Amino acid sequence: MAESVTMRELLARDGCLTLPGVYDGISARMADTMGFEALYMTGYGAVASSLGVADAGVASYTEMVDRVRVIAGAIRVPLIADGDTGYGGLLNVERTVRGYAAAGAAGIQIEDQEFPKKCGHTEFRRVIPEDDAVAKIRVAVDARPSRDFVIVARTDARYSDGLDAALRRAERFLEAGADILFVESPETPEELRRVAETFRGAALLANMVEGGRTPYLSADELGTMGFKLALYPGTGFLAAAASMRAAYAHLREAGIGTGGPALLPFEEMNALMGFPAVHAFEKKYGVTQVRAA
């Protein structure tokens, strides 16, 4: 990663920052070319694309930090990465924060669900005791390598215990040193406004999941409410899944890939993945390619 600005500097700017969800090398490179100022590694997308299973607590720390390393190494802007519950107790949280930072992330999200955790817009989520959740945030804050590495503190208590409980936890997370507050899945516009009004002046993140539990709003609308970050974690992988399904259906029926849904031209894909730099390297160091006559 060769970021020219830190997440903390981005948070100090005016306006609401749009964060697209990325989950692998291709999505990361694609989003990085589109002019976004920062990216977010979605746990759902990372687990789905690497393991082919649901985001239900099955991914390990090792699997996730490896994905952070891949994505951070492919982009030029800061990356916030989903750290789930920290993959265990307080010592695990410390290891996770340090590992994500060493892998190139500019920030990490830590949440208060019980293990095994689940995607924040699905059913049957439960949270750990409030004091234990606060302790995880304190450990995360102390474990980061510098203040430029931001801690996103997420609570899922709205679903299990109600909005008042979620706001109380978020307040304590802020007191523990969290840089960004993430109250997961408010279920009405009024609840979103209440979150924003309760923490006026704090850096607030709103999670916009297509088809999720929270009213789906634009970054401008969320910024007007008082949110600092508008996260769209599923847009990329939902679009990719729809495109692949259409392309594979056409291939199955027609017996050929072209002539159906739009495909990215091969040369554009090569450019996206860095082949021009590979060719320049080979020319610089005298690498020759042998072609059959």
Kindly label every feature range from the protein language model.
Residues A2-H250, K284-A293:
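Alpha/beta enzyme core
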Residues L251-A293:
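Flexible C-terminal active-site loop/helix
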